[in-house]
Amino acid sequence: MAHATLSAAPSNPRLLRVALLLLLLVAASRRAAGASVVTELRCQCLQTLQGIHLKNIQSVNVRSPGPHCAQTEVIATLKNGKKACLNPASPMVQKIIEKILNKGSTN
């Protein structure tokens, strides 16, 4: 009489490798989905513009210095949906911010 023995080792090592690879891919994709949090922990503006025409700007976000970045960042959202970093020390950018703040306070 033959007895069937169950073994803990898989009979197909290639199947095991494929399963482990799939598991690693799933884990990596989940980590990548949370990667946007990491980008918030550093300066967003590596290069800045000295100015941009006010008619092209939809909104402006001024980020104060903090643990994420030691400098003030001015990020303009343009009407075409793109974002542009502006130099907060530029006189033109300071005028843009002033006009947008005055426009918002009169409404």
Curated annotation (Swiss-Prot):
One of its GO terms (biological process) is neutrophil chemotaxis. Its main location: secreted. It is found in: Secreted. Residues 1-34 form the signal peptide. It comes from the Eukaryota. GO terms for molecular function: chemokine activity. It holds the Pfam family IL8. InterPro entries: Chemokine_b/g/d, Chemokine_CXC, Chemokine_CXC_CS, Chemokine_IL8-like_dom, CXC_Chemokine_domain, Interleukin_8-like_sf. The keyword Cell wall biogenesis/degradation does not apply. One of its GO terms (cellular component) is extracellular space. Disulfide bonds join 43-69, 45-85. N-terminal processed form GRO-gamma(5-73) is produced by proteolytic cleavage after secretion from peripheral blood monocytes. Keywords: Chemotaxis, Cytokine, Disulfide bond, Inflammatory response, Secreted, Signal. Gene3D superfamilies: 2.40.50.40. Ligand for CXCR2. Has chemotactic activity for neutrophils. May play a role in inflammation and exert its effects on endothelial cells in an autocrine fashion. In vitro, the processed form GRO-gamma(5-73) shows a fivefold higher chemotactic activity for neutrophilic granulocytes. Belongs to the intercrine alpha (chemokine CxC) family. This is C-X-C motif chemokine 3. The lineage of its organism: Eukaryota, Metazoa, Chordata, Craniata, Vertebrata. The gene is CXCL3.
